[in-house]
Amino acid sequence: MKVAFGMKAHSGWAALVVLGNRDGDFLVVDRCRVELVEDEWAKQPYHAAEDLNPDAARDVVLRGVATAYRIAVGEMREAVKRERERGNEVTACAVLVADPMPDWSIEEVLAVHFRMHKAEGALFRDALIRATKACGLRLVAIPEKMLTKHAESALKTPLSGLVKKIATLGKSVGPPWGKDQKQAALAAMVALQGPLEVKRSAAQPTSGNSRNRR
């Protein structure tokens, strides 16, 4: 069976819902929490670097970014492997994204507190996107605030119909089936429909721009 991933990132983890389509009906194949860090500080690497000297702060941030990317790729490969062992083919991965972040340097992010929150959110979304590409999956990056609109268009179904579909899926698997799972499932539905490509980027790379690279 062909399946698609739907993913919603948080600081240090992501919600994953795997959906398939059998005889025209969507079904939940799997859903789980994907851990994207090994250490507590890595959930907020910019915050961890906030009070350090510039060189040490940069090293901490870059280490956090590299670790998130590495873990995300490993977790994505494991998820694909699980589906192959079930006899399924993963056709795409939908990742919910936010508005692109300005191309701030690490120093510019650390200088303003709210930027740290934005950068950390972008980090884990970007990690999922990089992992999707590393595993050779078709990426469907969907702006979270446009998810319903894209779903209505891709599925040719009004909002009321989408709500019913998501509710039916939730009843079939039971809790947990909160906002994260619902949004990830809806994103996976969009991905299953075919090569929809949302051109909007997730976020600028969070390891800093060229001014910071040595």
Please name every model-derived segment.
Residues 1-201, 214:
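Phosphate- and other anionic-substrate recognition elements at nucleic-acid/protein interfaces
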